[in-house]
Protein backbone atom coordinates (compact mmCIF):
# COMPACT_ATOMS: atom_id res chain seq x y z
CA UNK A 1 0.00 0.00 0.00
CA UNK A 2 1.67 3.19 -1.14
CA UNK A 3 1.27 6.57 0.49
CA UNK A 4 -0.19 9.76 -0.91
CA UNK A 5 1.21 12.90 0.68
CA UNK A 6 -1.25 15.73 1.25
CA UNK A 7 0.51 19.06 1.71
CA UNK A 8 -1.15 22.27 2.84
CA UNK A 9 0.48 25.67 2.74
CA UNK A 10 0.11 28.89 4.69
CA UNK A 11 -3.01 29.70 6.67
CA UNK A 12 -4.71 26.39 5.92
CA UNK A 13 -4.31 25.56 9.60
CA UNK A 14 -7.04 28.21 10.04
CA UNK A 15 -9.64 26.28 8.04
CA UNK A 16 -13.03 26.38 9.72
CA UNK A 17 -12.48 29.84 11.18
CA UNK A 18 -10.81 31.86 8.40
CA UNK A 19 -13.31 33.39 5.99
CA UNK A 20 -15.85 30.56 6.22
CA UNK A 21 -17.95 32.11 3.44
CA UNK A 22 -14.99 31.44 1.13
CA UNK A 23 -13.39 28.33 2.63
CA UNK A 24 -16.24 26.66 4.53
CA UNK A 25 -16.54 25.49 8.11
CA UNK A 26 -14.59 22.24 7.83
CA UNK A 27 -11.34 22.25 9.77
CA UNK A 28 -7.98 20.99 8.58
CA UNK A 29 -8.53 17.95 10.81
CA UNK A 30 -11.83 17.31 8.98
CA UNK A 31 -10.03 17.54 5.64
CA UNK A 32 -7.36 15.10 6.80
CA UNK A 33 -10.03 12.56 7.81
CA UNK A 34 -11.70 12.94 4.40
CA UNK A 35 -8.36 12.40 2.69
CA UNK A 36 -7.54 9.30 4.71
CA UNK A 37 -10.95 7.78 3.96
CA UNK A 38 -10.70 8.58 0.24
CA UNK A 39 -7.20 7.13 -0.08
CA UNK A 40 -8.07 4.03 1.92
CA UNK A 41 -11.04 3.35 -0.36
CA UNK A 42 -8.55 3.30 -3.25
CA UNK A 43 -6.03 1.08 -1.45
CA UNK A 44 -3.63 3.80 -0.32
CA UNK A 45 -2.56 5.54 2.86
CA UNK A 46 -2.34 9.29 3.41
CA UNK A 47 0.30 11.33 5.17
CA UNK A 48 -0.78 14.92 5.88
CA UNK A 49 1.45 17.94 6.47
CA UNK A 50 0.74 21.65 6.87
CA UNK A 51 3.26 24.45 7.09
CA UNK A 52 3.20 28.21 6.95
CA UNK A 53 6.85 28.14 5.84
CA UNK A 54 7.94 27.84 2.22
CA UNK A 55 11.21 26.05 3.02
CA UNK A 56 9.43 23.34 5.01
CA UNK A 57 7.10 22.71 2.05
CA UNK A 58 10.09 22.53 -0.30
CA UNK A 59 11.77 20.00 2.00
CA UNK A 60 8.57 17.91 2.04
CA UNK A 61 8.42 17.94 -1.76
CA UNK A 62 12.06 16.83 -1.92
CA UNK A 63 11.25 14.07 0.58
CA UNK A 64 8.29 13.01 -1.56
CA UNK A 65 10.59 12.79 -4.58
CA UNK A 66 13.03 10.52 -2.73
CA UNK A 67 10.21 8.35 -1.42
CA UNK A 68 8.59 8.08 -4.86
CA UNK A 69 11.86 6.75 -6.26
CA UNK A 70 11.96 4.25 -3.37
CA UNK A 71 8.42 3.11 -4.19
CA UNK A 72 6.99 4.34 -0.89
CA UNK A 73 4.99 7.34 -2.10
CA UNK A 74 2.67 7.60 -5.09
CA UNK A 75 2.47 11.38 -5.37
CA UNK A 76 1.30 14.59 -3.72
CA UNK A 77 -1.99 16.42 -3.40
CA UNK A 78 -0.96 20.00 -2.69
CA UNK A 79 -2.85 23.12 -1.67
CA UNK A 80 -0.05 25.68 -1.69
CA UNK A 81 -2.31 28.48 -0.43
CA UNK A 82 -0.96 31.94 -1.16
CA UNK A 83 2.39 30.47 -2.26
CA UNK A 84 0.54 29.47 -5.43
CA UNK A 85 0.87 33.03 -6.66
CA UNK A 86 4.38 33.80 -5.45
CA UNK A 87 6.63 30.76 -5.23
CA UNK A 88 8.95 29.96 -8.09
CA UNK A 89 10.87 27.88 -5.51
CA UNK A 90 7.93 25.49 -5.00
CA UNK A 91 7.52 25.17 -8.76
CA UNK A 92 11.22 24.36 -9.09
CA UNK A 93 11.05 21.84 -6.22
CA UNK A 94 8.18 19.96 -7.88
CA UNK A 95 9.97 19.89 -11.23
CA UNK A 96 13.38 19.09 -9.75
CA UNK A 97 12.16 16.27 -7.51
CA UNK A 98 9.97 14.90 -10.34
CA UNK A 99 6.91 14.68 -8.11
CA UNK A 100 3.46 14.09 -9.60
CA UNK A 101 1.35 16.80 -7.96
CA UNK A 102 -2.35 17.52 -8.06
CA UNK A 103 -2.81 21.19 -7.19
CA UNK A 104 -5.92 21.86 -5.09
CA UNK A 105 -7.70 25.10 -4.23
CA UNK A 106 -10.81 25.16 -2.06
CA UNK A 107 -12.16 28.36 -3.57
CA UNK A 108 -12.41 29.27 -7.24
CA UNK A 109 -9.29 31.40 -7.37
CA UNK A 110 -10.23 32.60 -10.87
CA UNK A 111 -13.40 34.23 -9.53
CA UNK A 112 -11.47 36.15 -6.87
CA UNK A 113 -8.90 38.96 -6.85
CA UNK A 114 -6.79 39.30 -9.99
CA UNK A 115 -3.55 38.48 -8.13
CA UNK A 116 -4.97 35.00 -7.42
CA UNK A 117 -5.45 34.20 -11.11
CA UNK A 118 -1.82 33.24 -11.74
CA UNK A 119 -0.28 30.03 -10.42
CA UNK A 120 3.42 29.24 -10.41
CA UNK A 121 2.47 25.68 -9.39
CA UNK A 122 0.10 24.81 -12.24
CA UNK A 123 2.76 24.46 -14.96
CA UNK A 124 4.50 21.83 -12.80
CA UNK A 125 1.30 20.03 -11.74
CA UNK A 126 -0.12 16.84 -13.22
CA UNK A 127 -3.63 18.21 -12.62
CA UNK A 128 -5.60 20.94 -10.88
CA UNK A 129 -8.82 20.95 -8.83
CA UNK A 130 -10.27 24.42 -8.23
CA UNK A 131 -13.39 25.70 -6.53
CA UNK A 132 -14.88 22.43 -5.31
CA UNK A 133 -14.59 23.22 -1.62
CA UNK A 134 -12.80 20.73 0.60
CA UNK A 135 -14.21 17.96 -1.62
CA UNK A 136 -11.44 19.06 -3.98
CA UNK A 137 -8.95 17.13 -1.85
CA UNK A 138 -10.91 13.91 -2.40
CA UNK A 139 -11.12 14.66 -6.12
CA UNK A 140 -7.38 15.34 -6.11
CA UNK A 141 -6.64 11.97 -4.50
CA UNK A 142 -8.94 10.19 -6.94
CA UNK A 143 -7.40 12.04 -9.87
CA UNK A 144 -3.84 11.28 -8.77
CA UNK A 145 -4.56 7.57 -8.40
CA UNK A 146 -6.42 7.44 -11.73
CA UNK A 147 -3.77 9.43 -13.58
CA UNK A 148 -0.99 7.19 -12.27
CA UNK A 149 -3.14 4.05 -12.63
CA UNK A 150 -2.12 2.92 -9.15
Curated annotation (Swiss-Prot):
Keyword Repeat: no
Catalytic activity: 3-dehydroquinate = 3-dehydroshikimate + H2O
UniProt site (Transition state stabilizer): 18
EC number(s) reported in the record: 4.2.1.10
Keywords from the UniProt entry: Amino-acid biosynthesis, Aromatic amino acid biosynthesis, Lyase
GO BP terms in the entry: amino acid biosynthetic process; aromatic amino acid family biosynthetic process; chorismate biosynthetic process; quinate catabolic process
Highest taxon, organism lineage: Bacteria
Function: Catalyzes a trans-dehydration via an enolate intermediate.
Protein name: 3-dehydroquinate dehydratase
Amino acid sequence: MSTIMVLNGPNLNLLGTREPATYGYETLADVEVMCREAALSLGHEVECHQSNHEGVLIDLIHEAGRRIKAGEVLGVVFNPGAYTHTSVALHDAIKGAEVPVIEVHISNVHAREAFRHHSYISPAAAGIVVGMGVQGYVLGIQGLVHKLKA
